[in-house]
Amino acid sequence: MIIPIRILGDPVLKTPAKSVEDFDDGLRRLAQDMLETMYDAPGVGLAGPQVGISLRLFVFDDGVTGPTFMANPELGAADGEIVEEEGCLSIPGPFYPTRRFATITCRGQNLAGDPVEMTGEGLLARIFQHETDHLDGALFIDRLSEEGRKAVLAELRRIELGLAEPRQRRRADGE
């Protein structure tokens, strides 16, 4: 089932999420619905708060790992920095160069509640950081300079008014 994606201005996006405690059938259904929503959008990652669920969980597919679920993520060892364009399903349309670690480790739990650890480089590292920001009540525009934030919000307004077209989003399969 596709779940409506919450958009910039929704308070759930600015609220730190709570830990996942119940790894049950309801969580598995939610993960499947989130993946379906992410692919439909299209996007490469989707966090609980983006669908109105204030729990520390996200789903992703970077085109290499396949559909993956992560609960209660904690970011660990990080290395290097890279600035690449970044967008967000909750800020539909605009992209802006955003500084992130080039490589980062993410520890959390899978759908069974078992511990998992993954190290991401490039796009996967960006996904880990972007989605974890959502769980902390932050959006990618919170990482931008005042000038960058204004540029993203101005582009979003132009899109809303029909004066600009939203940029095509990246899909997990690269198309």
Q: What are the language-model segments listed below?
A:
Residues 1-175:
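Positively charged
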